[in-house]
Amino acid sequence: MAVQGFQRRLLGSLNSTPTAIPQLRLAANQTGARCLEVSIPDGLFLSLGLVSLVENVLVVAAIAKNRNLHSPTYCFICCLALSDLLVSGGNVLETVVILLLEASALAARAAVVQQLDNVIDVITCSSMVSSLCFLGAIAVDRHVSIFYALRYHSIVTLPRARQAIAAIWVASVLFSALFIAYCDHAAVLLCLVVFFLAMLVLMAVLYVHMLARACQHAQGIAQLHKRQRPLHQGFGLKGAVTLSILLGIFFLCWGPFFLHLTLIVLCPQHPTCSCIFKNFNLFLTLIICNAIIDPLIYAFRRQELRRTLKEVLTCSW
């Protein structure tokens, strides 16, 4: 958050666009050319952030309440929800402070606002990195449960899961602090982009491998029932659609933000890149949308968690 102009920022000086207003318009870049700028209303941004907060708080509360959910798999899901909660919470807090400063309802010295901005940036950046890590951890956990089913409980133990979780959080905080301190260095930005691509490749390879194994299993069952082609093809199509949705949402929600970082390194002054930079708030909103979708994909589809969630909502503690 810059004191002058009260700009919504996520990672230090990465964004130089003004606070969003509720419209879709053509904006002029530095050369006078026209480019498309999608502006996000503050009310919409806050609403999405609050929805994400509520969803992920419910996931964390449900897993904490039910001891049957204290397994490595649910620990990773809980940490993913906590990461998404912090992503949404940090951005909601930053936006609220900006609006209060703009309305002169909050008086603060420039140094205090800058320190608050730095804290929010570290929290938001570390939670974004940890969110990506836990998405990868969930994929690895599922892969082990399928390909090493008989040895799963000896491979993925609760102590090992806790060690992995602690390592992810520590690494995320350290990396975010480094990233905030040296965000003007191209190497740091590229490291973050490479990290995103690595997570994308990891998830794609693991889930495609799992889909192939599931199709083989379905084919074997179909052969026993002499229904090889209809059952196998139907299962394969359903699995491919599910996989496409999972990876598509991940890429759609996270990809534009990392494209933004890549273009900062490759073409910071190019007119076309300048047009893309103007949509920073849209890219940030897509990440908030991902924080809303994650519980629907990884948490609410599980019957035991849904049952516990009903108990939480009815306050039957």
Curated annotation (Swiss-Prot):
Entry GO terms, CC: plasma membrane
Transmembrane segments: 38-63, 73-93, 119-140, 164-183, 192-211, 241-266, 280-300
GO BP of this protein: adenylate cyclase-activating G protein-coupled receptor signaling pathway
InterPro entries: GPCR_Rhodpsn, GPCR_Rhodpsn_7TM, Melcrt_ACTH_rcpt, MSH_rcpt
Pfam families in the record: 7tm_1 (PF00001)
Glycosylation sites: N29
Subcellular location: Cell membrane
Membrane topology: Multi-pass membrane protein
Molecular function GO terms recorded: melanocyte-stimulating hormone receptor activity
Keywords linked to the UniProt accession: Cell membrane, G-protein coupled receptor, Glycoprotein, Lipoprotein, Membrane, Palmitate, Receptor, Transducer, Transmembrane, Transmembrane helix
Domain of life, source organism: Eukaryota
Ranges per topology, Cytoplasmic: 64-72, 141-163, 212-240, 301-317
Extracellular topology ranges: 1-37, 94-118, 184-191, 267-279
Lipid-substituted positions (S-palmitoyl cysteine): C315
Family statement drawn from the similarity comment of this UniProt entry: Belongs to the G-protein coupled receptor 1 family.
Assembly behavior: Interacts with MGRN1, but does not undergo MGRN1-mediated ubiquitination; this interaction competes with GNAS-binding and thus inhibits agonist-induced cAMP production. Interacts with OPN3; the interaction results in a decrease in MC1R-mediated cAMP signaling and ultimately a decrease in melanin production in melanocytes.
Job description of the protein: Receptor for MSH (alpha, beta and gamma) and ACTH. The activity of this receptor is mediated by G proteins which activate adenylate cyclase. Mediates melanogenesis, the production of eumelanin (black/brown) and phaeomelanin (red/yellow), via regulation of cAMP signaling in melanocytes.
Entry protein name: Melanocyte-stimulating hormone receptor
